[in-house]
Amino acid sequence: GADLIGNSGNLPLQGRDKVLAGVILDMALSSTIASSLDLGHSVLGQLSDVTALHQKRVEQAGFAVLKSPDIPSILVETGFISNRGDCRRLMDEHHRQRLAEAIFAGVQGYFRQRPPAGSYLAALSAQPPG
């Protein structure tokens, strides 16, 4: 976590003791990793209706671009261009559209269930039905 103090997102770490800042950052990252896994499960569930999955579970990796301490992040693999069947499907516009719609549905479903505070979705979910 200490390597990310320069990339603390919206966390209030400026002027804090370095040890305290590291603890706050580690706590935020742990929460964000859990949220990222939930988001990944939501997207993977939608993709399983569209294409064969290489892995039927969400995997974790330490990609630097996926380490924002305050934003759930996922990397979606939709196929391998080195695989002829995958490559053929990825060249098909209809298949790409279905993949995009599945990814969108997974992201949308995740955020509808867990709307970020102060967001449009949070405001919608706070309104009484009717």
Where on the chain are the PLM-derived regions?
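Active-site-proximal helix/loop segments of hydrolytic enzymes
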Residues: 1-130
